[in-house]
């Protein structure tokens, strides 16, 4: 490794000063709203079963117990919500072993996670909109459903499409090398959304995409009026995904079902299964209040607010320099 220049920070020092100022302003924003800042562990007895995450693991020296670096503070924060702590947010480090390369990823990154009890998805999106407008100084905001986005940009209804129709689109766009015979409709939709719809979100509007298909719910609740969709949304700016939000699933039994399904999917993909977080499950038995939440990539948010191109321009020492 050539250390002649890698010893220096990838971010200009002036950008690190600007980063600190933005984080100060964010903390002040939440303080003025009466939203409590919390701190939860980044080293945990459990990880998450989400198929999209490969966690970092380590062992305690004395007991040899396996521990995990958290990919998100979600479970710990929800355990606080069960105790009726009220609206909370956190700025913390998160770790994902499969997020590396490109302008927007680093295995260690800064997450802004925010939960608002007794707030439905649409009301919460408005709160998120107000916050992001404050951070990014944007004027135009657009809302579009996942279904409408597919119809608008690909002329296909994702809630009605057959697998053959999606495979034909994949073939048309020459994405065949990205799929396998066993890929589900959900996987095909994710590929098409990432490669053909997200590029169309590359403008100066803040864009909310909501009501993702039910089998892409992750830990979002299924919509009360249409069981084909979940109360999940994502927000984009200049083609960059900034945040992933839910009206949160609260039912313990449904959590267990989804966790089991996740581990089956992990094994099919050749990824190790993950023990389910028993502390989190126990908290759910006490009752998670109705709430909405979002995880925002803070490095990306700062990058965009400073009109920069990569998160390495706002991180002191990314993975190749640390």
UniProtKB/Swiss-Prot annotation:
SUPFAM superfamilies: Class II aaRS and biotin synthetases
Top EC category: ligase
Family annotation (Gene3D superfamilies): Bira Bifunctional Protein, Domain 2
UniProt EC number: 6.3.2.-
Transmembrane regions: none
Chain's role: With EpmB is involved in the beta-lysylation step of the post-translational modification of translation elongation factor P (EF-P). Catalyzes the ATP-dependent activation of (R)-beta-lysine produced by EpmB, forming a lysyl-adenylate, from which the beta-lysyl moiety is then transferred to the epsilon-amino group of a conserved specific lysine residue in EF-P.
NCBIfam families noted in UniProt: genX, PRK09350.1
Protein's UniProt name: Elongation factor P--(R)-beta-lysine ligase
Gene for this chain: epmA
């Amino acid at each position: 490794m050539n250390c002649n220049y890698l010893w220096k920070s990838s971010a200009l020092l002036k950008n690190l000063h600007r980063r600190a100022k933005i984080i100060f302003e964010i903390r002040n924003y939440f303080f003025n709203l009466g939203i409590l800042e919390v701190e939860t562990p980044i080293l945990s007895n459990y990880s998450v079963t989400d198929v999209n995450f490969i966690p970092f693991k380590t062992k305690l020296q004395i007991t040899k117990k396996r521990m995990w670096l958290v990919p998100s503070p979600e479970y710990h924060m929800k355990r606080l919500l069960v105790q009726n702590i009220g609206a909370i947010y956190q700025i913390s480090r998160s770790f994902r072993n499969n997020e590396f390369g490109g302008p927007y990823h680093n295995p260690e990154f800064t997450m802004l996670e925010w939960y608002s009890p007794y707030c439905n998805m649409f009301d919460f999106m408005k709160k998120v909109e107000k916050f992001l407008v404050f951070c990014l100084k944007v004027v135009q905001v657009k809302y579009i459903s996942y279904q409408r986005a597919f119809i608008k940009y690909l002329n296909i209804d994702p809630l009605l499409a057959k697998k053959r129709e999606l495979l034909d689109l994949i073939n048309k766009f020459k994405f065949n090398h990205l799929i396998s015979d066993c890929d589900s409709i959900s996987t095909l939709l994710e590929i098409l959304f990432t490669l053909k719809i997200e590029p169309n979100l590359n403008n100066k509007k803040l864009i909310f995409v909501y009501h993702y298909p039910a089998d892409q719910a992750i830990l979002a609740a299924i919509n009360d009026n249409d069981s084909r969709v979940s109360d999940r949304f994502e927000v984009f700016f200049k083609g960059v995904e900034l945040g992933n939000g839910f009206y949160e699933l609260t039912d313990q039994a449904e959590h267990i079902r989804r966790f089991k399904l996740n581990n089956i999917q992990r094994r099919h993909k050749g990824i190790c299964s993950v023990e389910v977080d028993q502390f989190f499950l126990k908290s759910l038995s006490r009752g998670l209040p109705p709430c909405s939440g979002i995880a925002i990539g803070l490095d990306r948010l700062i990058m965009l607010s400073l009109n920069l191109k990569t998160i390495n321009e706002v991180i002191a020492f990314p993975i190749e320099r640390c």
